[in-house]
Amino acid sequence: MDTSQEGYCFIMNSNIIEKALILGEKLSTLTSNDGKERSIFFTEESESIMGVGTEEIIIFCDTKEKKELEAYVDNNKKRDDLSHMHSHALDATFSVGDIQSVKGDWDENKINYQFVITSKHLFSIFIPPDLKYGLNLSKLLIGEYGKMDMSIWKRVGVKKFKEKDLGKGKKCINIPDCSDEQKIQHNRIWNEEFEKFFKRWNYINNNQLEYVVVQRKNR
């Protein structure tokens, strides 16, 4: 697989719950085994659908996709549900030699990034256009993806996905003005998407799909 293409990394974690998308600042570079530099960007979000704490998710995308995502966010900043955007800097350094390929699909209805972290892990992240609850993906989490700066992060475990975990998606992100009807709709969407994701990739990995749970240390 091609490891030379430029890629960008978005991280979502769990601090901003209400009506907020945090589009991160470019703050460091990633260097892969071939010596190519890759820039990293960060986003933050809040309580995850898996409901385990403050874990993170990392999304890699190429230059074109990053620009499209930023443009989408910029074009929607004046919407009430995206009116509290802020930038967040994170002083983490990553080694990304395991990144093998990055690709993504974009249309007006969805952002669907696919990326390979190692030869054994291929993930597809679905983010619906209504980002006020679309960011509720932070517990999908990541496979092994290289070395982390452990002064910033701590690894809290490796979990194997089990189909019984699908039921944990039945909660709505805590948006104050989210009606009961909206919560039902949100939960239905998330349960459907998580079920598709987990069943698909767990099957490909012979029911051995694992994800690494990491948590940012308190400063």
PLM feature segments, named:
Residues M1-S32, K36:
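Intrinsically disordered, compositionally biased low-complexity regions
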